[in-house]
Amino acid sequence: MTKLQGLQGLKHIKAVVFDMDGTLCLPQPWMFPAMRNAIGLEDKSIDILHFIDTLPTEKEKKEAHDRIELVEAKAMKEMQPQPGLVDIMRYLTKNGISKNICTRNVGAPVETFVKRFIPSELSRFDYIVTREFRPTKPQPDPLLHIASKLNIRPLEMIMVGDSFDDMKSGRSAGCFTVLLKNHVNGHLLLEHKELVDVSVEDLSEIIELIQNMNKESF
């Protein structure tokens, strides 16, 4: 575990929000290039969902969504869980800390992942926010929505993710941010370290982090 920001002034952690792709499940680096190829988006600086939203007709938007959902369906079949997944789910459930998911994916892959890889007694999530909620990450709105529904302050919530969008959304919302490092996102610690409070390599490392944060908050 690597601490990039100080822990001073933190409150008791009452909720954790997880990204899904690359966070709860192992990274699938081929997926986003495949989506861009499917909709003819060559400019990597343009957000996929934003590109679709700006298409001129509803027919074109639907066709583009259908194409990326085919890619997501393939990815869904190949999903594998992150190391430490069950450990962190068990800890949060046992200690009454709210579990939530915020993803730019659609609902079906989330439901499939939860049923396939998380034991039923640990599989209850308070809120699952997908891309049907707008605006999506990297805007703070999805996380602020979850905090509001839970009746907690954003600073009492951790955002766990593997991407710029996750860290930007978490920081903008006022949450504590945890970057799950992998073989393709190390650049975030160099280029956007101001967005990351702590980086981990295994989801189970978050257990010790929460224990320390909640101990220090009293």
UniProtKB/Swiss-Prot annotation:
The keyword Ubl conjugation belongs to this UniProt entry's keyword annotation = no
Instruction: Please indicate if the UniProt record lists Cytoplasm as a keyword.
Output: yes
Where in or outside the cell it occurs: the entry states:
Cytoplasm; Nucleus
**At the top level of its lineage, which domain of life is listed?**
Eukaryota
A molecular function (GO) term: pyridoxal phosphatase activity
GO annotation, cellular component aspect: cytoplasm; nucleus
Q: Keyword annotations for this protein?
A: Cytoplasm, Hydrolase, Nucleus
Pfam families in UniProt:
Hydrolase
- Known EC number(s)? 3.-.-.-
The record's CDD domains line, in alphabetical order, gives: HAD_BPGM-like (cd07505)
Q: What else is known?
A: Present with 396 molecules/cell in log phase SD medium.
What is the similarity comment for this entry? Answer: Belongs to the HAD-like hydrolase superfamily.
Protein's recorded name: Uncharacterized hydrolase YOR131C
Q: Please tell me the species this chain comes from.
A: Saccharomyces cerevisiae (strain ATCC 204508 / S288c) (Baker's yeast)
